[in-house]
Amino acid sequence: GESGIQVDEPHWPSASAGVTDVPDFVRDLTLPIYQGHGDRLPVSLMPADGTYPLGTAQYEKRNIALEIPVWDADLCTQCGKCVFLCPHSAIRARAFDAAAAKDAPPTFKHVPAKSKDFPVGTHISYQTAPEDCTGCGDCVEACPIHDKSNVSRRAVNMAPIAPLLDQERDNLAFFLRLPEFDRGAIKHNTIPSAMLLDPLFEFSGACAGCGETPYIRLATQLFGDRMLVANATGCSSIYGGNLPSTPYTVNGAGRGPAWSNSLFEDNAEFGLGMRLAADQLMIYAQQLVKEMAGEIGGDLAEAMVKAEQREEAGLYEQRGRVALLLEKLVASNHPRPKELASVAEWLIRRSVWIIGGDGWAYDIGFGGLDHVLALPYDVNILVLDTEVYSNTGGQMSKATPIGAVAKFSAGGKATAKKD
């Protein structure tokens, strides 16, 4: 007889259920892979040069959290620690003129900025991305504020997502439409202020509660609009660039980090090559500017070549000069305007970052790292030191402390951490 049990074919949920307006690339390539249909895609859809657009992790909307953080605006001191510690950029802070919130949804929270660094009338909001949060609770643990009458209540508290999902989705959509506050008016050297800068690393596939990603996100907040990243293989290359999406994204002007992953052992040299290439392109662009000074205008040409670009204000001014230069090149009769136009963006100084874990920095890539450190070039090196090979399951590295138990050192590591 019949058992009466029906076995249904497994069905992948549609990743596009909550997404209505996506770029063609995401619709044609990314979403089918999300839905488990990557094997049906023709090779002709793949990028011929291997480059993929940024900002595609925002379309995943994984909805994996059972609870999400809820901001208590009355208790909050606006310290920014919840935003700083969030591994997935699922809590955002933004400063804006109070008038910008006149059409906000009724449940959208915002309060006057406590810092005297902002103009009168500036408001601040802390907003959760409910469908991108992993529910790890790092934000609650980081919050230093307790209600004196109820110590279990903080300025950020976890709450079940079900009754909040629709309203917080609407609140997030409004929050993201608010204009980004002037970067030049924000202090970059304090956590409360720096957390008001838009992150250009969001919604990665890193483990819930990851301790690595906040540092990468912070780097993108400070330098992301001109950032070149050489990423060693490991956790950071998996959550940073695994198909079909990337958490690196762009700002409102379309600028964001350029990210690439090369051989594990060659990452330091790879990043050094980015620095040398960026410097050479800048030198070449400056030479063309000097040659065309008569067409461009002597004052503009001199200002571009001698621009100080160590601070936000200098970078802002140089971007304005480059925009003006490109306008002039369109009308130029000089035989080389197209050539200069193709390299004009390199007149803006790039921030080169070499990123990897301790397995790369202490072990497999140490020789190259030592070589790069000994050279006088301007590179930034971020070592995500977890003291084991995290991506492959927790094996001992030379960063593992003496006596620590890890894979390959079950009896405790016999030697001290490499200095």
Predicted feature locations:
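Thiamine diphosphate
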Residues: 239-240, 339-419
